[in-house]
From Swiss-Prot:
Annotated coiled-coil segments of the chain: none
PROSITE patterns the record matches: RIBOSOMAL_S19 (PS00323)
Top-rank taxon, per record: Eukaryota
NCBIfam families cross-referenced by the UniProt entry: rpsS_bact
Swiss-Prot/TrEMBL keywords: Chloroplast, Plastid, Ribonucleoprotein, Ribosomal protein, RNA-binding, rRNA-binding
Name of protein: Small ribosomal subunit protein uS19c
Molecular function, one GO term: structural constituent of ribosome
Subcellular location(s) per record: Plastid, Chloroplast
Signal peptide limits: none
Family stated for the protein in its record: Belongs to the universal ribosomal protein uS19 family.
Location (main, coarse): plastid
Gene Ontology cellular-component terms listed: chloroplast; mitochondrial small ribosomal subunit
Length: 93
């Protein structure tokens, strides 16, 4: 179920305030945030936002194609190391 249009997209208040402040000053600093559930808005285009994935901050450069997605979509939390080639259990003859 999608979010109500009446409510609007969720963006953490502290993140939105920082971005609006940087836009007013014309700065392009790297922002760090733990808010993976914040929606990317058009005012964030051109900024680099470091999103926490549970272990480290992953820098995400926001482009126009990312608008409407969540910040957490671009900072994966799990590392896939690949399947083992010589795994006999996986082969099953």
């Amino acid at each position: 179920m999608t979010r109500s249009i009446k409510k609007g997209p969720f963006v953490a208040d502290h993140l939105l305030k920082k971005i609006e402040k940087f836009n007013a000053q014309g700065q392009k600093k790297v922002l760090t945030t733990w808010s993976r559930s914040s929606t990317i808005l058009p005012v964030m285009i051109g900024h680099t936002i470091s999103t926490y994935n549970g272990r480290e901050f992953i820098p995400v450069f926001v482009t126009d194609q990312m608008v409407g997605h969540k910040l957490g979509e671009f900072a994966p939390t799990r590392t896939f190391k690949g399947h083992v080639k010589s795994d006999k259990k996986a082969k099953r003859r």
